[in-house]
Amino acid sequence: MNQANNVLDSIYQPDLEIMNQPEIELDDLLIEEDEDLLLADDGDIDEFLEPQTDEDDAKSGKAAKSRRRTQSKKKHYTEDSIRLYLQEIGRIRLLRADEEIELARKIADLLELERVRERLSEKLERDPRDSEWAEAVQLPLPAFRYRLHIGRRAKDKMVQSNLRLVVSIAKKYMNRGLSFQDLIQEGSLGLIRAAEKFDHEKGYKFSTYATWWIRQAITRAIADQSRTIRLPVHLYETISRIKKTTKLLSQEMGRKPTEEEIATRMEMTIEKLRFIAKSAQLPISLETPIGKEEDSRLGDFIESDGETPEDQVSKNLLREDLEKVLDSLSPRERDVLRLRYGLDDGRMKTLEEIGQIFNVTRERIRQIEAKALRKLRHPNRNSVLKEYIR
């Protein structure tokens, strides 16, 4: 995983077996049903809305009254918008397994068309016209446009039918710096990406696959947008050293080290250690209750040093996408990057070592590497990998 991330860093510098199912009428599947709707329970909607608070009665004057009216209107507008949205998505029928598979097939067909378009755009050095695109996939223009239309409708249907999953996941991340409305918006972007990446032939349900993408989008947005106090870089480095030292001492002593022991190993005073811990809001106990109901523990939200199932999914997805991008390079360019970044054996080789393998000079290997990285920075290629950049 580290080797793959090294490639990403270089690119972005400066700049279940599936059962046979009968075919489904897509026109029936891709329309909004008017009957047999699943209605949302209005009684559950209020739990997603932030509680209203009374204005301080001590405030007086026109300015305070005007401010209260503006805030009240804005709050009611937001709550009404969320309420309406939840009611609307509650009316969307959930997909059956066979419908999910059929939609996934149509989306895969759409993505194949879009890959052809990307290659054509790179070749022409401009956006291709529909007629050129249709010719590239060997279809008459009307048939091509219908196929494209069906694929896009299938993607929209897959996303719309799983919006309740976004709400369910977003609810778990409330009161962490982003409004519920923003959490839904970020989660929906993750859902769209999941629909674009889903491979139904691998045998898992779309909801299982989409959950990872939704969580990733939400947690990344929280990390990027919700921190109001940003610490200096050097302080982050010290915090990281404290964590590593604490872990090392725990392994050496077979118990949790004291503040004095950590400070001694770090060669700093206890006062400084406590100050840094307070600045970073490091928890004294991972059992500290979190949230209004105090039904969660701080430890639930601390990243583990071990590889979680989500980490494994991310690792596999990155490997697959990186392989696809590397396949677009020439064999020599691909081999040079594999050796340079240790993608096969985990060992990064020097320019001299690679030059000896190919019987060329160090400078020639540097040129090949630079050319390969320039190609990977092309928008048609780096768009595939950009989602992994934090």
UniProtKB/Swiss-Prot annotation:
Residues 62-75 have a biased composition (Basic residues). Residues 325-378 are annotated as: Sigma-70 factor domain-4. It is found in: Cytoplasm. A motif (Interaction with polymerase core subunit RpoC) lies at residues 182-185. InterPro entries: RNA_pol_sigma-70_dom, RNA_pol_sigma70, RNA_pol_sigma70_r1_2, RNA_pol_sigma70_r2, RNA_pol_sigma70_r3, RNA_pol_sigma70_r4, RNA_pol_sigma_r2, RNA_pol_sigma_r3/r4-like. Interacts transiently with the RNA polymerase catalytic core. This is RNA polymerase sigma factor SigA. It comes from Nostoc sp. (strain PCC 7120 / SAG 25.82 / UTEX 2576).
